[in-house]
Amino acid sequence: HESGQYLFPGSGGVEEIGEGAGRGTALNVPLLPHTESDSYLAAFDRVVPHALAHFGPDVIVAQCGADAHYKDPLADLLLSSEAYETLFRQLLTLADKHTDGHILCTLGGGYHLDAVSRIWTVLALVVQDIDLPTSLPDDWRERWTAHIDEDLSPTLHDPEPSFNVKRRAAIAEQNKETSEQMLEQVTPHWH
């Protein structure tokens, strides 16, 4: 998630690791604004498989919000729809490995209607193992464009995003350090 230093409600720091018997069970990786897909996916890969291997859950409950998408007006993360597809596929693979395929995907978060509708459609298709279409129906796009006063994307995936993030390398390095710091905070509590 985006760092609470930049986004309401201001919580979710690496030091927030749970309390009492739950100490070490809250895992927060506060990412810097302008985190791009590669850095986000790297943080996911660094943390989530490790945590699932430790906790051995019976089921994965994944909140699949779309507010990390680069078009979202409230957050400052820069994920593409392709990154979301990668995350969804990785979650299914992890569910197969750790929970015998048991996963519950919930929806919530995301405030750009075109991006949200496409990302959640990608999720629905990936979960059902259905190939993603190369384009969206023109009549559907025309009908809904009239309701949201914005042109809808002709495809489920974004055009190749190109961001002019001047601190790209520094952001990626800080996100790497943050995810490693979080693991250093929680793993001593894992027995």
Regions found by a protein language model. Give the residues of each.
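A general "terminal functional-core" signal
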Residues: 1-191
